[in-house]
UniProtKB/Swiss-Prot annotation:
Region: Disordered, residue numbers: 43-72
Protein name (database record): Membrane protein insertase YidC
GO biological process: protein insertion into membrane; protein transport
Record carries keyword Ribonucleoprotein: no
Keyword terms, alphabetized: Cell inner membrane, Cell membrane, Chaperone, Membrane, Protein transport, Transmembrane, Transmembrane helix, Transport
InterPro entries: Membr_insert_YidC, Membr_insert_YidC_N, YidC/ALB3/OXA1/COX18, YidC/Oxa/ALB_C, YidC_ALB_C, YidC_periplasmic_sf
Locations listed in the record: Cell inner membrane
Gene, per the UniProt record: yidC
A GO CC term assigned to this protein in UniProt: plasma membrane
Membrane topology annotation: Multi-pass membrane protein
Keyword Plastid: no
Length: 560
């Protein structure tokens, strides 16, 4: 029993070590390998659109056969030309050249906890970093496919703001060419991180107009600014898509380096994932779209879609649209927005345990209003659910402690003959009605819960910068003073004293080292996870002490 229990504890230590040092290797890979898919393209390939306001805005737009033309110089758009839009949850800037969202900040999510007035910036196209949401009209008559460059839109004003009491805000960008009038409309709603981009096409020319809507996310290979290094980990940074054939497929930067992906799909979505936040383009459900990943001529990574061809007769009007989400990974919101989009909150292979844990945490938090106390009450609830199992385990361990003198006598009797010693131990266990595996049950039960809670704390945006009390101001990062890990190590030491001492000296030495090893590992774990483990240990100590004393009292009474 002691050997198996030691193996289990060492295994948990190894798992802990892997989670701290190997997260990027295990979690950063695509869930499914991507392949180059040859399809009959229902629409032109997704174009390389220009870098934006601080770069030479080259056309670099491929023709209908997917070949890229040589870049052409077009007017440079400066910061003063950007169109600024502010709602209660979004603060963004639109580049009039092409109508791309070149900058986007999230006012309700501070960049750092010690600078609450500096919002987290999701999109940025200022030179040092490239990350933006692009859309346009390509194809036969699309203004974004012109050899002379993308359209430069005009607006009635340079600044727009959602006023108090106003629930909707429309920002219209206008452009005319060859008798065709275009309006690119951005529609914002109070409290929402999703916005609708609609193209209104008024064909006043004397010939039919034909084009395709495209929408894409473009990003360079820079690091994730939302990923904390305080835990010693890095979360997944890369693209993802959802189709009816392949729900939730990750496409990493390495996958895109290996080759482009092209698939014609119905509806779905394309997204770019990072720690706590996600951006996604969502086309109309009924459209057949060409989804594509690729690397552009500047080395940026692109995931996007091109919609079906749209034809507008002379004198007629038409519109086409798509939805952009740019904000936190809020599961409830994402689930309502598009099927499968909530899967971007990736809880790993134990998602079926992690999701109920998060659901419980949310409901507890709605009552207590503090995520730290929510973790404590969740731990108490879990311990209560598994108490019958734990009680049986502690009873087995108490009986093991009671027969410790007999085990010592067997050790003296058989010396170094391990085979005879093992046989004698099994006979003793059978005689005393002891389950040699009984003491392993608490560890087996805790491991999947421990791992699942790890994903929940690290992936759920609700935990970002969530304070507890005293020195714990952020449950999603390590304890800045390492107080909780030290307390955790102390509780492990106390818990170890309640367990029977292994008869083998080497096993005993290994067991004594476990609190020190675990304390070292937990130094870099999120404070919320260490809090869970501390509370779990305290409750385990209380349960074990109570059950052990109860059994000892019953044994003494029977002996009397």
């Amino acid at each position: 029993m002691d050997i198996k229990r030691t193996i289990l504890i060492v295994a948990l230590a190894i798992v802990s070590y892997v989670m701290v040092l190997k997260w990027n290797q295990d979690y950063g890979q695509a869930a499914l390998p991507t392949q180059n898919v040859a399809t009959n393209q229902a629409a032109p390939a997704i174009p390389d659109t220009p870098l934006g306001n601080n770069a030479s805005a080259s056309a670099d737009v491929p023709s209908a056969n997917g070949e890229t033309s040589a870049p052409l110089e077009t007017p440079v758009v400066t910061n003063k030309d950007l169109i600024h839009v502010k709602t209660d949850v979004l603060d963004l800037a639109i580049d009039p050249q092409g109508g791309d969202i070149a900058q986007l900040k999230l006012p309700l999510y501070p960049r750092r906890q010690d600078h609450p007035d500096v919002p987290f910036q999701l999109f940025d196209n200022g030179g040092e970093r490239t990350y933006l949401a692009q859309s346009g009209l390509t194809g036969t008559n699309g203004p974004d496919a012109r050899a002379t460059g993308r359209p430069v839109y005009s607006t009635e004003q340079k600044t727009y703001q959602l006023a108090d009491g106003q629930n909707q805000l429309n920002v219209d960008l206008k452009f005319s060419l060859d008798g065709v009038n275009y309006i690119k409309r951005f529609s914002f709603t109070r409290g929402l991180y999703d916005l609708k981009v609609t193209y209104l096409i008024d064909n006043e020319s004397g010939k039919p107009w034909s084009g395709n809507l495209f929408a894409q996310l473009k990003r360079d290979a820079s690091s994730d600014p939302s990923s904390s290094t305080a835990t010693g980990t890095a979360t997944y940074l890369g693209a993802a898509l959802w189709t009816s054939n392949e729900p939730y497929k990750k496409v990493s930067m390495k996958d895109i380096d290996k080759g482009s992906l092209k698939e014609t799909v119905q509806g779905g979505w394309v997204a770019w994932l990072q720690h706590y936040f996600v951006t996604a383009w969502i086309p109309n459900k009924g459209d057949a779209n060409l989804v594509q990943t690729r690397k552009d001529s500047q080395g940026n990574y692109i995931i996007g879609f091109t919609g079906p061809a749209l034809t507008v007769a002379p004198g007629a009007k038409a519109e086409t649209s798509a939805t952009l989400y740019a904000g936190p990974k809020s599961q409830a919101v994402l689930k309502e927005l598009s099927p499968g989009l909530e899967l971007t909150v990736d809880y790993g292979f134990l998602w079926f345990i992690a999701q109920p844990i998060f659901w419980l945490l949310q409901h507890i938090h709605s009552i207590v209003g503090n995520w730290g106390w929510s973790i404590i009450f969740l731990t108490m609830l879990i311990k209560g659910i598994f108490f019958p199992l734990s009680a049986a385990s502690y009873k087995s361990m108490a009986r093991m402690r009671a027969v410790a003198p007999k085990l010592a006598a067997l050790k003296e009797q058989h010396g170094d003959d391990r085979q005879k010693m093992s046989q004698a131990m099994m006979e003793l266990y059978k005689k005393e009605k002891i389950n040699p595996l009984g003491g392993c049950l608490p560890i087996l039960v805790q491991m999947p819960v421990f791992l699942s809670l790890y994903w929940v704390l690290l992936e759920s945006v609700e935990m970002r910068q969530a304070p507890f009390m005293l020195w714990i101001t952020d449950l999603s990062i390590k304890d800045p003073f390492f107080i909780l890990p030290i307390i955790m190590g102390a509780t492990m030491f106390i818990q170890q004293r309640l367990n029977p001492t292994p008869p083998d000296p080497m096993q005993a030495k290994v067991m004594k080292m476990m609190p020190i090893i675990f304390t070292f590992f937990f130094l870099w774990f999120p404070a919320g996870l260490v809090l869970y483990w501390v509370v779990n240990n305290v409750l385990s100590i209380s349960q074990q002490w109570y059950i052990t004393r109860k059994i000892e009292a019953a044994t003494a009474k029977a002996a009397a």
